[in-house]
């Protein structure tokens, strides 16, 4: 059985492991390594994830393995890598293929931008590949699809761009959810009921968005001189649409520094 090696053990690594371990453990031997990989042991035990913890010494043995990089981008050169990987899957924001290939020898490279919804196998993940070897590529893409859906974009810069749509976006949507919950409280709902209504609204909206464009959803809800269009006019006057676009742009720009 082939080996899938996770380098890193932070929030994203844990989310991916939680959402995909049942599928991945049938296809791969799972390994986790990093500076202090034993830190993830309580999490593995709690979630009943079968993975081997490999302490880091002088170098990480990557030979003939699928290697998933899930640490901070600036730590790429802090590790020594020994051997040639079959595939390097990188979730390192702002790190291009050239930097990856200079640091790690591999037959295949895949750059991706997953999000924290990986823990429910609901990540929306933009991917781009280099040095495509069909059999290796298929297995690498299957790894990505084990924790959500996979959107193949045209170039590696577009993977970085997807921070706006599926990376930082969940934090921005959380701010929206929190604001709607507080709005409900202001209008007289208790906190529990308000949050429950917001959660179901998000669930319903996600279903609507599968079939319809955002503009069409707005059109179906708004009536002439109605309550919703009145509220939307306030949001437009306050520049909420532009603020979201600017926030996403600044997140992408910060990542590319």
Swiss-Prot record:
Pfam families: F420_oxidored, P5CR_dimer
GO cellular component, one term: cytoplasm
Reactions catalysed, as given in the entry: L-proline + NADP(+) = (S)-1-pyrroline-5-carboxylate + NADPH + 2 H(+); L-proline + NAD(+) = (S)-1-pyrroline-5-carboxylate + NADH + 2 H(+)
Entries under SUPFAM superfamilies matching the protein: 6-phosphogluconate dehydrogenase C-terminal domain-like, NAD(P)-binding Rossmann-fold domains
Any one GO molecular-function label of the UniProt entry: pyrroline-5-carboxylate reductase activity
Pathway(s) where this gene product acts: Amino-acid biosynthesis; L-proline biosynthesis; L-proline from L-glutamate 5-semialdehyde: step 1/1
GO BP, one annotated term: L-proline biosynthetic process
Enzyme class of the recorded protein, top EC level: oxidoreductase
Annotated keywords: Amino-acid biosynthesis, Cytoplasm, NADP, Oxidoreductase, Proline biosynthesis
EC annotation from Swiss-Prot or TrEMBL: 1.5.1.2
Gene3D superfamilies named among the record's database cross-references: NAD(P)-binding Rossmann-like Domain (3.40.50.720), ProC C-terminal domain-like (1.10.3730.10)
Localization: Cytoplasm
Claim: Translocase is one of the keywords in the record: no
Family: Belongs to the pyrroline-5-carboxylate reductase family.
Entries under HAMAP family matching the protein: P5C_reductase
Biological role stated in the UniProt entry: Catalyzes the reduction of 1-pyrroline-5-carboxylate (PCA) to L-proline.
Designated name of the protein: Pyrroline-5-carboxylate reductase
Species the sequence originates in: Helicobacter pylori (strain J99 / ATCC 700824)
Gene name in the database record: proC
């Amino acid at each position: 059985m082939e080996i899938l090696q996770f380098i890193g053990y932070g929030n994203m690594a844990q989310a991916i492991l939680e959402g995909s371990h049942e599928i991945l453990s049938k296809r791969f031997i799972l390994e986790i390594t990093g500076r202090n990989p034993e830190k993830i042991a309580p999490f593995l035990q709690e979630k009943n994830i079968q993975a081997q913890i490999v302490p880091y010494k002088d170098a990480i043995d990557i030979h003939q393995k699928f290697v998933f990089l899930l640490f901070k981008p600036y730590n790429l050169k802090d590790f020594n890598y020994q051997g040639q990987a079959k595939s390097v899957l990188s979730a390192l924001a702002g790190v291009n293929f050239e930097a990856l290939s200079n640091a790690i020898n591999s037959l295949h490279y895949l750059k991706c931008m997953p999000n924290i919804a990986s823990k429910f196998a609901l990540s929306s993940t933009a991917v781009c590949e280099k040095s495509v070897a069909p059999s290796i590529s298929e297995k690498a893409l299957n790894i990505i699809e084990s924790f959500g859906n996979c959107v193949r974009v045209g170039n590696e810069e577009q993977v970085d761009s997807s921070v706006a749509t599926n990376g930082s976006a969940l934090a921005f949507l959380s701010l929206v959810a929190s604001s709607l919950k507080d709005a409900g409280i202001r209008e007289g709902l208790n906190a529990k009921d308000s949050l429950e209504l917001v959660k179901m609204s998000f669930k319903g909206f996600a279903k609507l968005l599968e079939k319809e464009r955002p503009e069409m959803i707005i059109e179906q809800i708004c009536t002439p001189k109605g309550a919703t269009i009145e509220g939307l006019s306030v949001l437009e006057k306050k520049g909420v649409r532009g603020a979201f676009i600017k926030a996403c742009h600044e997140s992408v720009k910060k990542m590319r520094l």
